[in-house]
Amino acid sequence: IFLSFRLAMSTEAPGQFPRIRMRRTRRTPALRRLVVETGLSASDLIYPVFVLDGDKRTEQVASMPGVERQSIDLLLGTLGEAVDLGIPAVALFPVIDADKKSLDGAECANPDGLVQRTVKAIKEAHPDLAVITDVALDPYTTHGQDGIIDDAGYVMNDETVAMLTRQALSHAEAGADVVAPSDMMDGRIGAIRNALEAA
């Protein structure tokens, strides 16, 4: 009866009061669930986390109250809570020690690097959790740019794309489910896709 009533309302007088009274469809939780346009639950979420090297380390993120960076060992416990809540995916953002940064950000593709070790640890501890990795050079460069720069400080697009491709491949080899480029280099999506397909 309810469904046919709604269909009749929509064909007889679309958008005209008093025939259309949306309050009718909002009066009980069950009716609201039937007509809801968008539903959002824990299974729709991706949990962003900041990981740092070391053991039993945490650091508060001053600009984001209540958010902290964690070492891998502590992060695994936090992710266990996320899994228990029904959150299906995690997005990793590394905090790289200064001594591992360089002009070209080559540490990003280290198979034993922070992100790569984190991906492996997560997949071992929580195999059903989807792992998304950030493909970007800014955490790894001494200058903080998201690309390899020349002597004049100009970002070299193609050289950067080559490094980002190496990074994405190393993440995939470590077990990442999704590699997510966040840089702004021209052509990097195609280059990464081609390299992943060829691997």
Locate the predicted segments by residue.
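Short, Lys/Arg-enriched N-terminal segments with co-localized hydrophobic residues
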Residues: 1-8
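N-terminal amphipathic alpha-helix/helix-capping segment at the start of soluble metabolic enzymes
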Residues: 10-57
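Alpha/beta enzyme core
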Residues: 53-199
